[in-house]
UniProtKB/Swiss-Prot annotation:
Binding residues annotated for L-serine, in chain numbering: T231, S232, E233, E285, S385
GO BP term, pick one: selenocysteine biosynthetic process
Similarity comment: family membership: Belongs to the class-II aminoacyl-tRNA synthetase family. Type-1 seryl-tRNA synthetase subfamily.
Task of the protein: Catalyzes the attachment of serine to tRNA(Ser). Is also able to aminoacylate tRNA(Sec) with serine, to form the misacylated tRNA L-seryl-tRNA(Sec), which will be further converted into selenocysteinyl-tRNA(Sec).
Annotated metabolic or biological route of this protein: Aminoacyl-tRNA biosynthesis; selenocysteinyl-tRNA(Sec) biosynthesis; L-seryl-tRNA(Sec) from L-serine and tRNA(Sec): step 1/1
UniProt-recorded name of the protein: Serine--tRNA ligase
Cellular component, GO annotation: cytoplasm
Sorted UniProt keywords: Aminoacyl-tRNA synthetase, ATP-binding, Cytoplasm, Ligase, Nucleotide-binding, Protein biosynthesis
Gene source species: Ruegeria pomeroyi (strain ATCC 700808 / DSM 15171 / DSS-3)
Domain notes: Consists of two distinct domains, a catalytic core and a N-terminal extension that is involved in tRNA binding.
Catalytic activity entry: tRNA(Ser) + L-serine + ATP = L-seryl-tRNA(Ser) + AMP + diphosphate + H(+); tRNA(Sec) + L-serine + ATP = L-seryl-tRNA(Sec) + AMP + diphosphate + H(+)
Residues reported to bind ATP: R262, S263, E264, E349, I350, S351, S352
Record's subunit section: Homodimer. The tRNA molecule binds across the dimer.
InterPro entries: aa-tRNA-synt_IIb (IPR002314), aa-tRNA-synth_II (IPR006195), aa-tRNA-synth_II/BPL/LPL (IPR045864), Ser-tRNA-ligase_type_1 (IPR002317), Ser-tRNA-synth_1_N (IPR015866), SerRS_1_N_sf (IPR042103), SerRS_core (IPR033729), tRNA-bd_arm (IPR010978)
């Protein structure tokens, strides 16, 4: 959500920022609705003052026996009451229209975000690790001999349809180990508070983080009205929904491992094989709630937390900053981390780390109380994958593959796998 006062003060700057995201200028429409709404509110207040004045005079007219004046004033009070109700209803309708217009507009990009139309204009910041040279043709994860029994797409399709997978045996254990390793790292080393939250949330929570109203088709809703979360960002960020937090309570840093659900609307034909794009998947999420002065530094901190997971696993990656045309709806700035997948001979996204400024906080009405006793201000919110567990499994399998189809697993997983770091071609660990 956007600050209407900032739009009033500098509508040209607002339109210019929107244009960087490819959106048409809309400040004139916003200000027209705002002016009409404020006009109705002022008219209702004026009518209320007239009604109050007439109400006081009714008693005086009655006391002095002026029946004609008494009746005139009574009629005036009733007339003003009807006027007030009508103007308040009109103001409410205009307020709804204004809120709906503002709710459909994306966040404004930070000044340092590169200008661009799509992913081709994203800017690489740095790389870590060197892709391993293999003296054989590397395979994609789903073709490896060692996962043929443990990564079952056929049975999953029988159970649920396309874009699902059934993991079993050692592959399921490695998947679980990765999630546990991420959670332990974030909670024990990176200082995040572990949360186990609901995966079913109210519409208000989806609105708070920006999934609604514009992107409802991307998620699943139950008959009872709950939404299945597309990411734990929804559950974690909305912990502060409707709250006013003491400044010394900031920053709040959360992490959670959860199931996530996405309809993948608009993704027909993309990544139809394997685990890269699923309707149901698992992710370890990071969320920070900060003072506005500290959000840029916090984003870099979160980025390092996510990058550190890949470094510990020995997975080569590159980090890019998304251009204005490729950022998500609620983001002010986004860094993507892409892991090297030798089976595809390319880097693929495994994490996005975004700062949203006060965009989500305004939708959630989440504020903090300054330590100096000043007026409450909106917090800043940030979110990032730390990491997508299924995609991390893909990266571990493909980067650790051997010529015979077995996989050498990262040393970091040894404590979670009983020290067994070889996934054999028969699907066993040793």
């Amino acid at each position: 959500m956007h600050d209407i006062r900032a739009i009033r003060e500098n509508p040209a700057a607002f339109d210019a920022a929107l244009s960087r995201r490819g959106s048409a200028p809309v400040s004139s429409d916003i200000l027209a609705l705002d002016e009409a709404r404020r006009g109705k509110i002022l008219a209702a207040e004026t009518a209320q003052a007239d009604q109050n004045k007439a109400s006081k005079e009714v008693g005086a007219a009655k006391a002095r026996g002026d029946e004609a004046e008494f009746e005139r004033l009574r009629a005036l009070v009733a007339e003003k009451k009807a006027e007030i109700a009508a103007m308040q209803a009109e103001a409410k309708e205009l307020d709804t229209q204004l809120s709906e217009l503002l709710a459909g507009l994306p966040n404004l990009p930070a000044e340092d975000v590169p200008q661009g139309a799509d992913e081709a204009d994203n800017v690489e910041l740095h790389r870590w690790g060197t892709p391993r040279e293999m003296d054989f043709a590397p395979k994609e994860h789903f073709d490896l001999a060692s996962v043929q029994d443990g990564m079952d797409f056929e049975t999953a399709a029988k159970l649920s349809g396309a874009r699902f997978v059934l993991l079993s045996g050692a592959v399921a254990r490695i998947h679980r180990a990765l999630a546990q390793f991420m959670l332990d790292t974030h909670s024990e080393q990176n200082g995040l508070t572990e949360v186990n939250g609901p995966v079913l949330v109210l519409s208000e929570m989806m609105y708070g983080t920006g999934q609604l109203p514009k992107f409802g088709e991307d998620s699943y809703q139950t008959r009872e009205g709950w939404w299945l979360i597309p990411t734990s960002e929804v559950s974690l960020t909305n912990i502060v929904n409707g709250s006013t937090i003491a400044e010394d309570y900031l920053p709040r840093r959360y992490t959670a491992h959860s199931l996530c659900f996405r309809s993948e609307a608009g993704s027909a034909g993309k990544d139809t094989r394997g685990m890269l794009r699923q309707h149901q998947f698992e992710k370890v999420e990071m969320v920070s709630v900060t003072h506005p002065d500290h959000s840029d530094a916090e984003q870099k901190r979160m980025l390092r937390c996510a990058e550190g997971i890949l470094e510990a696993l020995g997975i080569p990656y590159r980090t890019i900053v998304l251009c204005t045309g490729d950022m998500g709806f609620g983001a002010r700035r986004t860094y993507d981390i892409e892991a090297w997948l030798p089976g595809q001979n390319t880097y693929r996204e495994i994490s996005s780390v975004s700062t949203c400024g006060d965009f989500q906080a305004r939708r959630m009405n989440a504020r903090f109380k300054p330590a100096d006793g000043g007026k409450p201000q909106f917090v800043h919110t940030l979110n990032g994958s730390g990491l997508a567990v299924g995609r991390c499994l893909i990266a571990v399998l493909e980067n650790g593959q051997n010529a015979d189809g077995s996989v050498t697993l990262p040393q970091a997983l040894a404590p979670y796998l009983g020290g067994k770091l070889t996934l054999n071609t028969d699907g066993t660990l040793n």
